[in-house]
């Protein structure tokens, strides 16, 4: 015997094996694309940018939020052949702002490693032998 039980906000439905064997008669309700409580991705159904998308990692807020929005909007709406090539000034302004707040906008480790001077590598006996062999072969 199947039955339904409400627990707080949840509704628990117990069904029998026979209930599962018959096709469902439930009708699906189409999602409302304009539902303000529905979570959306980066681009809203109307094509606008969803500044509240968690995928932006909070970049749209904070001390450089306006510069980020300006650069990102320019890129999103760019119609140039090389998309965003008309947005260099906006991206430069965003970068300059972010450099003022290194604690909030840390640079990638890869960039930091590239900026470090390269330390000389100690030569091992193997590399000296290889160099001597090459020098002897070229003589």
From Swiss-Prot:
Major subcellular location class: mitochondrion
Compartmental location: Mitochondrion intermembrane space
Region ranges (Disordered): 104-139
Molecular function GO terms recorded: protein-disulfide reductase activity
Single GO cellular component term: mitochondrial intermembrane space
Swiss-Prot/TrEMBL GO biological process terms: cellular response to leukemia inhibitory factor; cellular response to oxidative stress; establishment of protein localization to mitochondrion; mitochondrial disulfide relay system; mitochondrial DNA repair; mitochondrial respiratory chain complex assembly; positive regulation of cellular respiration; protein import into mitochondrial intermembrane space
Modifications after synthesis and translation: Forms intrachain disulfide bridges, but exists in different redox states.
Entry keywords, A to Z: Disulfide bond, Mitochondrion, Oxidoreductase, Protein transport, Redox-active center, Translocation, Transport
KW Mitochondrion (keyword) present: yes
Motif interval(s): Cx9C motif 1: 64-74
Function (record text): Central component of a redox-sensitive mitochondrial intermembrane space import machinery which is required for the biogenesis of respiratory chain complexes. Functions as a chaperone and catalyzes the formation of disulfide bonds in substrate proteins, such as COX17, COX19, MICU1 and COA7. Required for the import and folding of small cysteine-containing proteins (small Tim) in the mitochondrial intermembrane space (IMS). Required for the import of COA7 in the IMS. Precursor proteins to be imported into the IMS are translocated in their reduced form into the mitochondria.
Subunit structure, as described in the record: Monomer. Can form homooligomers. Interacts with GFER and forms transient disulfide bonds with GFER. Interacts with MICU1. Interacts with COX19 forming transient intermolecular disulfide bridges. Interacts with COA7 through transient intermolecular disulfide bonds. Interacts with AIFM1; the interaction increases in presence of NADH. Interacts with NDUFB10.
Protein's name according to its UniProt entry: Mitochondrial intermembrane space import and assembly protein 40
Source organism of this protein record: Rattus norvegicus
């Amino acid at each position: 015997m199947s039955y339904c039980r409400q627990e707080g906000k949840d509704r628990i439905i117990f069904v029998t094996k026979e209930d599962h064997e018959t096709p469902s008669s439930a009708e699906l309700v189409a999602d409302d694309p304009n539902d303000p409580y529905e979570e959306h991705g980066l681009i809203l159904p109307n094509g606008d940018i969803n500044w509240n998308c968690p995928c932006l990692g909070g970049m749209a807020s904070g001390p450089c939020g306006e510069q980020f929005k300006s650069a990102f909007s320019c890129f999103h709406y760019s119609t140039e052949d090389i998309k965003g090539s008309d947005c260099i000034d906006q991206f430069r302004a965003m970068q300059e702002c972010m450099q003022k707040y290194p604690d909030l906008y840390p640079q990638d480790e890869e960039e930091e490693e590239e900026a470090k001077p390269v330390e000389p590598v100690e030569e091992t006996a193997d590399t000296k032998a290889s160099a001597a062999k090459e020098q002897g072969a070229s003589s």
